[in-house]
Amino acid sequence: MGASIDDYSLVHKNILHSEDLLKYILETSAYPREHEQLKGLREVTEKHEWSSALVPADEGLFLSMLLKLMNAKRTIEIGVYTGYSLLTTALALPEDGKITAIDVNKSFFEIGLPFIQKAGVEHKINFIESEALPVLDQMLQETKEEDLYDYAFVDADKSNYANYHERLVKLVRIGGAILYDNTLWYGSVAYPEYPGLHPEEEVARLSFRNLNTFLAADPRVEISQVSIGDGVTICRRLY
């Protein structure tokens, strides 16, 4: 039986529906460790009309930890918005680290740019204003085997995640990680039907149901679906 939108709160972009527990995690563990420029960017973005697209602070710390454990140096980011996850990545990379960041809307990126500059990490970022698929196709033609990427983070148009995956699994090195954000989509992916969603939300929900099934069966990667934020699926390339 499908769940109703009335049964589960979609107010917060977080799989954790206990507001008290989420507040505890953020205030006890996440905010005290949040870089001052990330805090500033978060506070500005929270006032934006599309603030629900903001990566939560606890997820940001998770991404930072993963990048450091991997000793990642070359990364790709598809979907930037105001740049919270991008700044998180730039802060986690070594001084000579490089990020290829792709988004169709540079004006959102420019909201976060002053915070990136104040953090002293702008030199690590190559921002490309474009649809992602043509850029990825060009990168596939130009990237040599020894220059493959360590890590990719995708938080963009949901219906294209599977298309991005086919490119990224070739651009990221064996042993590298590809992360897909929002793969639990407010928890709605658990149900064959979820009445009451806006049509665009429903398209995304169905895309994630298909993607989750596809990734679970893809022999090229091993996966872990992490219930942080709105769900993050980590794919480690095997071959």
UniProtKB/Swiss-Prot annotation:
Name of the coding gene: N4OMT2
SUPFAM superfamilies per record: S-adenosyl-L-methionine-dependent methyltransferases (SSF53335)
Keywords: Alkaloid metabolism, Metal-binding, Methyltransferase, S-adenosyl-L-methionine, Transferase
Protein name, per record: Norbelladine 4'-O-methyltransferase 2
Role, per record: 4'-O-methyltransferase converting norbelladine to 4'-O-methylnorbelladine. 4'-O-methylnorbelladine is a precursor to all Amaryllidaceae alkaloids such as galanthamine, lycorine and haemanthamine, and including haemanthamine- and crinamine-type alkaloids, promising anticancer agents.
Binding-site residues, a divalent metal cation: 155, 181-182
Binding site for S-adenosyl-L-methionine: 55, 77, 79-80, 85, 103, 132, 157
Matching PROSITE patterns: SAM_OMT_I
Catalytic activity: norbelladine + S-adenosyl-L-methionine = 4'-O-methylnorbelladine + S-adenosyl-L-homocysteine + H(+)
GO biological process, one term: methylation
Cofactor: Mg(2+)
Family, similarity comment: Belongs to the class I-like SAM-binding methyltransferase superfamily. Cation-dependent O-methyltransferase family.
EC number assigned by the record: 2.1.1.336
MF terms in GO: metal ion binding; O-methyltransferase activity; S-adenosylmethionine-dependent methyltransferase activity
Pathway(s) annotated for this protein in UniProt: Alkaloid biosynthesis
